[in-house]
């Protein structure tokens, strides 16, 4: 029994609401869930909360591309995220969204307190402006070369390669992500958070034990470079919360995102009146708050976040725990290799408990990257969980049921039981310190001992002799009791298996009951609890991940399989039947304005045999075009796709209406037509050069 009950609030970083969860994401949620489940198993009051990070430029852009409201898009993504987490047995106490009334009020509260305490500065800045779209370009509207490490193709707020943060104006060779134009400078009024005012507090906090040593050392480098005032403003258009008393100005997503932890807990408090928000977040709180994050967002969580909390009168977290990235088969996750695996694709093929165990077996308290080697994954799960753990019960339970009325014997020799129980503090310390890999090794070493005991005793031989029936009863009862202890130790990692084992033993598995005497206790008939990992299922998962390359959030509909098949059967020598036209000069070609367009709507045209009516978004303007592709496409195949159109073709009045351009397609005609589909990174309105 825990000596005293702790009050704990634990969070995982908020997944961004513009796409699906993948196995790289799942590392963090499994890591946090194991820690939360362990705390609850020890009898502590632990609340595990999370939310979707639902604001910012990327979400606004994607919603525009899909032709739907941002609110509708994030609601759908939230639903998908929650289902993925639930199916991986991640047990949040509350899952919310940063686009909520609780979060709006909390963000405004913290901002106003910072402002009133003198930590918000206002000044006019020169910001990048898109001359073609007549709009300011916030961070994610701009891409260019990182000013720190010189990595190309980086966003305007932080570098994915080196983790540095900067303003969009610092980018080298910036380009508008909206139009592709080179931006110009224009003045605008912005609000800044005075981060340098908290340097002393932050230096003390970062060396207080709140961070891993690797993180604290990295922060020392940033302190040496000097802290900068932090721009917390974004100009309209922006999907987020408007700043109080500042029409047309919005909170930068990284201001209200971590506040989402507080907003989600506020939402939980409303559902559970016995919970007190101030008891966990008040300045003098004695409760514990822990954040689990990826190493790519250390800067925000270890500098901006504690400073914002301190400056607005709230408590700082006890610790921020960072983890590394996930690689697959020793390399970065790859769509072309099928190793960029979505959570849902994994769930379609494999048991989530497999991955929970594999991640646990390789996790430590350090910030090292974790490699998901798919061959090792199958071998380890089969060896540890099936061959060692579950096999311990499957080899012995049948004898108890068939020969001893399903009742366990009183164990006379408790030497093994005592040895297993003696490891509970070691295993507990490993869970507490997030050294899950060490905990798994301790548990599997015990499983080896238990299996060796059964193999040496050979109860299947004992039961053949009348004078060894009681000895067989003792061996099998002892083995099952050891199995119960092992699964109790593993309950935070394997909750579904633990549930099955609880049904088998017909009693709950609790840490306090590890030493429970089960003499005379009746068990249920044994049922298979875990199947081996079959490599053909792993390979099918990888194959499906390759197929998923054709299904992106930007283009949710793909061509029908029969069209794809036809594409490979078209003549390999099209130039024979359709030779290249006469040469033109460059000036003639330059007159043609080709633009990326998104097909917002497609519909049949009454009394037209060949035409479909298309509504095309070309980036702030909608065009109506009649296209002769009815023989090759149905309207539902087209909606949401990107294509290429001739944007400066003179409008043509047809008897069905005005056609304001032309979409481009390839093929001999009839059903053998394929509209041009640009790379998913292209945006409506971009010029094709």
From Swiss-Prot:
Entry keywords, A to Z: Aminoacyl-tRNA synthetase, ATP-binding, Cytoplasm, Ligase, Metal-binding, Nucleotide-binding, Protein biosynthesis, RNA-binding, tRNA-binding, Zinc
Motif segment ('KMSKS' region): 332-336
The protein's required cofactors: Zn(2+)
Segment forming the signal sequence: none
Gene3D superfamilies in UniProt: HUPs (3.40.50.620), Isoleucyl-tRNA Synthetase, Domain 1 (1.10.730.10), Methionyl-tRNA synthetase, Zn-domain (2.20.28.20), Nucleic acid-binding proteins (2.40.50.140)
GO molecular function, one term: methionine-tRNA ligase activity
Chain positions recorded as Zn(2+) binding sites: 146, 149, 159, 162
Enzyme Commission number(s) of this protein: 6.1.1.10
Listed GO biological process terms: methionyl-tRNA aminoacylation
Location(s), subcellular: Cytoplasm
Lineage top rank: taxon: Bacteria
CDD domains named in the record: Anticodon_Ia_Met (cd07957), MetRS_core (cd00814), tRNA_bind_EcMetRS_like (cd02800)
Location of the motif 'HIGH' region: 15-25
Residue intervals of the tRNA-binding domain: 588-689
Parts of the chain that traverse the membrane: none
Location, primary (coarse class): cytoplasm
Function: Is required not only for elongation of protein synthesis but also for the initiation of all mRNA translation through initiator tRNA(fMet) aminoacylation.
Quaternary structure note: Homodimer.
Homology family: Belongs to the class-I aminoacyl-tRNA synthetase family. MetG type 1 subfamily.
Protein name stated in the entry: Methionine--tRNA ligase
Organism: Shewanella baltica (strain OS195)
Gene name in the database record: metG
